Amino acid sequence: MQSNSSSFPDWHGTTILAVRKNGSTVIAGDGQVSMGPTVVKGNARKVRRLAGGKVVAGFAGATADAFTLIERLEAKLEQYPDQLARACVDLAKDWRTDRYLRRLEAMLLVADKTAIYTVTGVGDVLEPGESLGGGAVAAIGSGGNYALAAGKALIDLDLSAEDIARKAMGIAAEICVYTNGNLTVESL
């Protein structure tokens, strides 16, 4: 996450991972927020339950921007109850076309019991492909590629979705200096 102004230091942080396996969906997020080389917070909560607990969302990027997007997603979920894909697509459309929203610098990882979506400001609503065993993994944030690789390596092993998420996030925290092991884990 980089600031738009050279007068502010770069903000980094956040690794969010979603794992779906055997009817269980988990989103895990680390707690670290860094400004340049300094950790400014180690216990941030970047994963939230929405829609009466039926949806879980994690965010990466500018915090205020992410909160704005979470609020917009909640409104879309009220407008389209039990239609997560439609709510995400409608949010992405608004995000891309609205003059105010298109300036927001964040990404969302959103899931219900049956699907996981990565939602971006350029209009992307991406659903991860399934593994041979039927599971799925998606990740965003500074350590997202590390968590994604670890999750994909673990998905077909005899582990629960939560165990995979915790192990993959632990691996990401060992590699990415902007990710810590202080996890928030929400399961559906």
Curated annotation (Swiss-Prot):
<dbReference type="InterPro" id="IPR023333">
    <property type="entry name" value="Proteasome_suB-type"/>
</dbReference>
<feature type="binding site">
    <location>
        <position position="176"/>
    </location>
    <ligand>
        <name>Na(+)</name>
    </ligand>
</feature>
<dbReference type="InterPro" id="IPR022281">
    <property type="entry name" value="ATP-dep_Prtase_HsIV_su"/>
</dbReference>
<comment type="function">
    <text>Protease subunit of a proteasome-like degradation complex believed to be a general protein degrading machinery.</text>
</comment>
<feature type="binding site">
    <location>
        <position position="179"/>
    </location>
    <ligand>
        <name>Na(+)</name>
    </ligand>
</feature>
<dbReference type="InterPro" id="IPR029055">
    <property type="entry name" value="Ntn_hydrolases_N"/>
</dbReference>
<protein>
    <recommendedName>
        <fullName>ATP-dependent protease subunit HslV</fullName>
        <ecNumber>3.4.25.2</ecNumber>
    </recommendedName>
</protein>
<dbReference type="GO" id="GO:0009376">
    <property type="term" value="C:HslUV protease complex"/>
</dbReference>
<dbReference type="GO" id="GO:0046872">
    <property type="term" value="F:metal ion binding"/>
</dbReference>
<dbReference type="Pfam" id="PF00227">
    <property type="entry name" value="Proteasome"/>
</dbReference>
<keyword id="KW-0915">Sodium</keyword>
<dbReference type="InterPro" id="IPR001353">
    <property type="entry name" value="Proteasome_sua/b"/>
</dbReference>
<comment type="similarity">
    <text>Belongs to the peptidase T1B family. HslV subfamily.</text>
</comment>
<dbReference type="GO" id="GO:0004298">
    <property type="term" value="F:threonine-type endopeptidase activity"/>
</dbReference>
<keyword id="KW-0963">Cytoplasm</keyword>
<feature type="binding site">
    <location>
        <position position="173"/>
    </location>
    <ligand>
        <name>Na(+)</name>
    </ligand>
</feature>
<dbReference type="GO" id="GO:0005839">
    <property type="term" value="C:proteasome core complex"/>
</dbReference>
<feature type="active site">
    <location>
        <position position="14"/>
    </location>
</feature>
<keyword id="KW-0888">Threonine protease</keyword>
<keyword id="KW-0479">Metal-binding</keyword>
<dbReference type="GO" id="GO:0051603">
    <property type="term" value="P:proteolysis involved in protein catabolic process"/>
</dbReference>
<keyword id="KW-0378">Hydrolase</keyword>
<keyword id="KW-0645">Protease</keyword>
<keyword id="KW-0021">Allosteric enzyme</keyword>
<comment type="subunit">
    <text>A double ring-shaped homohexamer of HslV is capped on each side by a ring-shaped HslU homohexamer. The assembly of the HslU/HslV complex is dependent on binding of ATP.</text>
</comment>
